[in-house]
């Protein structure tokens, strides 16, 4: 899973 915004699953979530 790759997050882009913060260190959580919010905006840039590519799962």
Curated annotation (Swiss-Prot):
Cofactor(s) listed in the protein's UniProt record: heme b; Ca(2+)
Source species, domain of life: Eukaryota
UniProt keyword list: Calcium, Heme, Hydrogen peroxide, Iron, Metal-binding, Oxidoreductase, Peroxidase, Secreted
Cofactor note: Binds 1 heme b (iron(II)-protoporphyrin IX) group per subunit. Binds 2 calcium ions per subunit.
Catalytic activity entry: 2 a phenolic donor + H2O2 = 2 a phenolic radical donor + 2 H2O
Enzyme class: oxidoreductase
Binding site for heme: 9
Binding-site residues for Ca(2+), renumbered to this chain: 10
Gene Ontology cellular component annotations, sorted alphabetically: extracellular region
Cystine crosslinks: none
MF terms (GO), sorted A to Z: heme binding; lactoperoxidase activity; metal ion binding
Location(s), subcellular: Secreted
Principal localisation: secreted
EC number of this enzyme: 1.11.1.7
Family that this chain belongs to: Belongs to the peroxidase family. Classical plant (class III) peroxidase subfamily.
Protein function: Removal of H(2)O(2), oxidation of toxic reductants, biosynthesis and degradation of lignin, suberization, auxin catabolism, response to environmental stresses such as wounding, pathogen attack and oxidative stress. These functions might be dependent on each isozyme/isoform in each plant tissue.
Name listed for the protein in its UniProt record: Peroxidase 4
């Amino acid at each position: 899973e790759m997050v882009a915004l913060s260190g959580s699953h919010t905006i840039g979530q590519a799962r």
